[in-house]
């Protein structure tokens, strides 16, 4: 057993608990750690250590998050749990804790509540691809029909937000019962772990995705041409590859004739590496910071999209006053700011610091984007909001 623990050859999957306040998210997190450590080995974590979540700052936004880890025989999981509702909203929108799948906790005693709905909507907006339901506190409900009713309600709610409500796994259990070592409820935690293993597909690694590198800097080197530098976000760039330069101006294609890192020439650059790419026949003034270098056809430039946005509170260094329609801030995508116009949902006149809101944004110049891309909202270089592209219109 001890040998297996140190093998990091297992696929790594990021998950997290979501759901209404007091439905048992943190208790479930503790129960998973405790039961799986008993069954498969690993470290148990108690409720208190998870509930005292440390504060972190992600893009200037204060978020309290607990990170725990656990193993099943086939996978290693990193799991996030947040103490407060506001922390979930911030976490999901900033992508501070990207999730490959979410565990939606719904108390059988209450059924779906307002935050249940809000977390499902947020999950849809920010692109959590898979949701598994853990119906908690089932030991407090004697009526089998009531349990069925709650399950049906949760499935319908998920379907309403385009999750496959009829097909996704719903596990009826008791996190507290499992934490207290009651066998029938411990078995439900193992069932949940098995559902995570089978229902959430292995995430595609960044290196296997189509190549993309945000351009941070552009140099021209006498006699060699133009070099663009940046950190490769995904995929692999090989010498000789055809690449597209996307965003801000019309898309052009060129060939990468050299890749270098720390002044050494390489055959290729991979996701996560900071490299310089030499571009054939490209002039210094044809490329700029804020564009991306990408595999041709893999990403397109857009100006108009729907987004889910969190507006920083005054305490987080955000605005002190609300903003209204007609507000024109800068939207910071990857490496650059672009001015944009916003339109607010019907019936919303103003947005207060600390709110989260859906807004449609129209940028003055196009940016390479796909759904799920994160951005910051800035005024004069100061971050006042964070958002994610939910749906592209144009």
Curated annotation (Swiss-Prot):
It comes from the Bacteria. One of its GO terms (cellular component) is cytosol. It is an enzyme of class 3 (hydrolase). Residues 136-139 are annotated as: G4. Residues 174-176 are annotated as: G5. Keywords: Cytoplasm, Elongation factor, GTP-binding, Hydrolase, Magnesium, Metal-binding, Nucleotide-binding, Protein biosynthesis. Residues 10-204 form the tr-type G domain. GO terms for molecular function: GTP binding; GTPase activity; guanosine tetraphosphate binding; translation elongation factor activity. Its EC number is 3.6.5.3. The keyword rRNA-binding does not apply. HAMAP family: EF_Tu_B. This is Elongation factor Tu 1. It comes from Vibrio vulnificus (strain YJ016).
């Amino acid at each position: 057993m001890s040998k297996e623990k140190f093998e990091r050859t297992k696929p790594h999957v990021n998950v997290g608990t979501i759901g209404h306040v007091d439905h048992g998210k943190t208790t479930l997190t503790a129960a998973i750690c405790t039961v799986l450590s008993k069954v498969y080995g690993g470290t148990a974590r108690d409720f208190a250590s998870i509930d005292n979540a440390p504060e972190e700052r992600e893009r200037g936004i204060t978020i309290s998050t607990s990170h725990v880890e656990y193993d099943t025989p086939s996978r290693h999981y990193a799991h996030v749990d947040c103490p407060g509702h506001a922390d979930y909203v911030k976490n999901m929108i900033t992508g501070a804790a990207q999730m490959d799948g979410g565990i939606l906790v719904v108390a059988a005693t209450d059924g779906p509540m307002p935050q249940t709905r809000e977390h499902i909507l947020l999950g849809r907006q920010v692109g959590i691809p898979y949701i598994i339901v853990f119906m908690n506190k089932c030991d407090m409900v004697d009526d089998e029909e009531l349990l069925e009713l709650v399950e049906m309600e949760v499935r319908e709610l998920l379907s309403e937000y385009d999750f496959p409500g009829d097909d996704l796994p719903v596990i009826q259990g008791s996190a507290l019962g499992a934490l207290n070592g009651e066998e029938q409820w411990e078995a439900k935690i193992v069932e949940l772990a098995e559902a995570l293993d089978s229902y959430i597909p292995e995430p595609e690694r960044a290196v296997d995705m189509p190549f993309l590198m945000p351009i941070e800097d552009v140099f021209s080197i006498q006699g060699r041409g133009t070099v663009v530098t940046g950190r490769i976000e995904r995929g692999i760039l090989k010498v000789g590859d055809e690449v597209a330069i996307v965003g801000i101006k019309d898309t052009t294609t060129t060939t990468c004739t050299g890749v270098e890192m720390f002044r050494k020439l390489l055959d290729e650059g991979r996701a996560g590496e900071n490299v310089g790419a030499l571009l054939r026949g490209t002039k210094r003034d044809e490329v700029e910071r804020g564009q991306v270098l990408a595999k041709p056809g893999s990403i397109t430039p857009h100006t108009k999209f729907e987004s889910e946005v969190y507006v920083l509170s005054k305490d987080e260094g955000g605005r002190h006053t609300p903003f209204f329609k007609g507000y024109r801030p800068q939207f910071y995508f990857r490496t650059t700011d672009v001015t944009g116009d916003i339109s607010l949902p019907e019936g919303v006149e103003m947005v207060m610091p600390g709110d989260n809101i859906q807004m449609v944004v129209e940028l003055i110049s196009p940016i390479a984007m796909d759904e799920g891309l994160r951005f910051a909202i800035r005024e004069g270089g100061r971050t006042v909001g964070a958002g994610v592209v939910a749906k592209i219109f144009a």
